[in-house]
């Protein structure tokens, strides 16, 4: 509630009492590390440059007093090239090794998760007034959460997109930074892990639950989300599956679009977590659907719960989001 005249630019009190704006929470940086290309470029430049200098200065075999200074320069440059090659080579190896380690780590979870080989989508969208449905043609992944949590105690769910590499655990901790560079078991790794916003409820009961994940160049994690700006890809992948310790859900995708992290904190932010009433939530849902880069026949109302998947756009400056409503699947997991 505004009091006095703090908003009047002619009032000197406005300098002392500026308008109070809602806090803006930073959106996690979920792009892949761009420096592997720099490391690779330095390695190539060092190897090529070193080879050129080696041939130019030592092939002639001139080591007289008059050429001593020139030879010293050549040795110095060659030594620098060797050092750069060793350093950049190590960094390239480190990054590639982390890719391999992450793949091995997630492959180790295969024994705790049984993903059906064949899945089918329902022929038509469900009645939006019906919170549950009995879909005998939908077979969710079977997840042994008890054993899974022995390896990753912060795991709260499992997200999968049939017939793709997107098949990962979802974690959550008390911040949005830790799992940007740690695997589900706490191992440091730049690939990180999918994780829910720390302000969300762990049971996915909020109106909007956000899951963040990296856009990795090797195609892992949330890399394929950026393909949802293509209508053909969306048409072939309209649903994802979310399994939790308390049940399973179908994520029926209704919107996919790019956004700027600066939008966080605004009324139309896709990362919004709370609304003052049903009307505000309905307005937000409509705005999200209107922003979509693809056409979807999925309807959303104020009674629906939304799952928002957030990753970086290529280049890392923007964000790409895929949004869907969660529909409880009323069958055995």
Task: Annotate each PLM feature.
Residues 1-129, 312, 332:
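Gram-positive cell-envelope targeting signals
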Residues 85-333:
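Solvent-exposed, non-transmembrane regions of membrane-associated and secreted proteins
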